[in-house]
Amino acid sequence: MKGVIFCLVVLLWRQAWVSSKSHKCDFTKEKYLLSGEKEVSCEIDANPSDDITFICPNKIDSLCFHTVNISKNINQNKSTMSIQDLLYGSVVYGNTLFISPYVRTNTPFYCFCNLDTVTIQKFLKINRFLKDDDELSEADVMKHLKGGNVSEAQADEYLNKALNRFKKMKDLSKFFNDQADNTTKLNLPKSLNIPNDILNYDVYNSSNNRNDIVVKDEVTNKQIISKRGIMSVFVRSNNNVIKGCDFGNNNKNYFSHPISVAGKVNNKVCKIQGKPGELVGFKCAFEENGKVEPPNCFDQVLHKNKVTDLKTLIPGYASYTNKHSSKYPYYLKIPHFVNEQYTIQCKCKSNNSQNEYTFELDIQPGESEVVLNSFKTS
């Protein structure tokens, strides 16, 4: 019975997110660090509503993703552009970009990563410190499982290691995505317990960062050379207008309900109906000092005029927001099962304290089309 339940969960999980995909370019990986090429590339072919994570020890030029390079030639003048100008409706949070659900034209852009010899040595040490020496490779695990000679204790051990590894990856991803703003240097969480001599390796050895010094990796004996990492992204277009409200911009028409905040009206309400499985959202008027209430919408929302944790109403939702800036849109992926109808709100507060714009979402009960189609027989 457990096996049937597990398979059903996996099936639903895979089909639930079939419309979006996560991409990552991680230039701290050994294949990039130990490459003998002066340029190393990571190419991403993305669609609207996908997310992209850019992990780089030392970013060059634009910090990605608040601004990105629109030319592969880093020396070209005026080659950077704000992500809101290039892909309106996208959200940047930490080292991750959630691509706008509506992209009008095919859009390429680039991010660059500086990998000098000292930085490379530092991250090789970090990678090797974090690697669990007694951890079996995925191939070894599958070999044991297929052989049928795995005891229950060994199976539990494999499962625990997999869960621990997943937790470590999840915690690290959360740390990267919760960063207040992208910076040139890559920060690492204290929870990894990386020794200070490794964390500060680049500080202690900065004088050795010279092209005339031959450096070899202490483990593989491969020569280490300085190089540039290039993340090349190609985002494909679509024709899906975003279901939601855009306060303060009635010209772009990226959202289904573009609303101008011009004039003397101090309070406007934009009402949207959302069904299970749908992605909905809103964007406040662009103001550097504007704010949203509750501050961590959609994790918290206004329900019956009270601040409420959304997970108590519709567990299983997903939100895409920048916790440190209200200039980006706020998106909510409604879960595929909703028990009952709920009406929730988030408010955009203007610099002028008298101005308030309300996003009101009427969440309908039931099951999503993905779930319903999963149980249909051909």
From Swiss-Prot:
Subcellular location: Cell surface; Cell membrane
The keyword Cell membrane appears for this protein: yes
Entry-listed glycosylation sites: N77, N149, N182, N205, N351
Signal peptide positions (record): 1-20
Cystine pairs: C25-C42, C56-C113, C64-C111, C245-C270, C284-C348, C297-C346
PROSITE patterns: 6_CYS
Transmembrane segments: none
Domain of life of the source: Eukaryota
Keyword Ribosomal protein: no
Gene Ontology CC, one term: symbiont-containing vacuolar space
PTM per Swiss-Prot/TrEMBL: Processed into a soluble form.
SMART domains in UniProt: s48_45
Record Gene3D superfamilies: 2.60.40.2860
Disruption phenotype: No visible phenotype. Parasites grow at normal rates in vitro.
Keywords attached to this entry: Cell membrane, Disulfide bond, Glycoprotein, Malaria, Membrane, Repeat, Signal
Domain 6-Cys: 21-133, 241-375
Subunit structure: Heterodimer; heterodimerizes with PF12. May form an antiparallel heterodimer with PF12.
Note: Does not have erythrocyte-receptor-binding ability.
Protein name as annotated: Merozoite surface protein P41
Lineage of producing organism: Eukaryota, Sar, Alveolata, Apicomplexa, Aconoidasida
